[in-house]
């Protein structure tokens, strides 16, 4: 059973992503993490995800909160920053196709940044619990997703190391 992303009451839960995909079948194809997967695999993954919407200025999550989901931006834009909203350091501006919160699938640790909706957003979310269900039900597919997440995080880390002298870097904008 798909577990909703209920940690954050500020997001409007659209429910199971599968009916949304029937109405708009190419939604997940927009997401960079799923572009290399066959359509049948994308359909399977969608059954383990929920859709959400959030209006401008909605805080999706805050730095320091324990994460329990990875989010994919289907529409809209998100500002990712550390520290104070006014004087903090911008880590990235993420738009359609980008993802954030990936580490929440892997570990139960505090979020490293705050994410705020800049332009009204639609998200597809994978909770840690749902990823564990995907792993139990479709291990080959879960390994593929995990490898892609690891590759994405590796690219971000590599870019961060290359641009270290520039401050906190714009590494979240890579995918």
Segments from the language model and where they lie:
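Cytosolic regulatory regions built on CNB/CRP/Popeye-like sensor folds
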Residues: 1-175
């Amino acid at each position: 059973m798909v577990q909703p992303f209920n940690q954050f009451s500020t997001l409007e839960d659209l429910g199971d992503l599968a009916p949304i995909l029937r109405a708009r079948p190419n939604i997940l194809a927009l997401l960079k993490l799923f572009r290399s997967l066959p359509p049948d695999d994308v359909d399977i993954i969608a059954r383990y995800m929920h859709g959400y919407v959030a209006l401008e200025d909605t805080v999706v999550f805050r730095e320091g909160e324990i994460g329990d989901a990875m989010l994919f931006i289907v529409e809209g834009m998100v500002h990712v920053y550390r520290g104070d909203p006014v004087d903090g350091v911008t880590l990235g501006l993420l738009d359609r196709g980008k993802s954030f919160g990936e580490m929440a699938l892997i570990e139960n640790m505090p979020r490293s940044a705050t994410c705020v909706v800049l332009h009204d957003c639609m998200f597809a979310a994978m909770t840690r619990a749902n990823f564990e269900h995907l792993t139990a039900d479709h291990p080959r597919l879960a390994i593929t997703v995990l490898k892609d997440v690891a590759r994405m995080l590796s690219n971000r880390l590599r870019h961060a190391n290359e641009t270290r002298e520039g401050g906190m870097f714009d590494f979240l904008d890579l995918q």
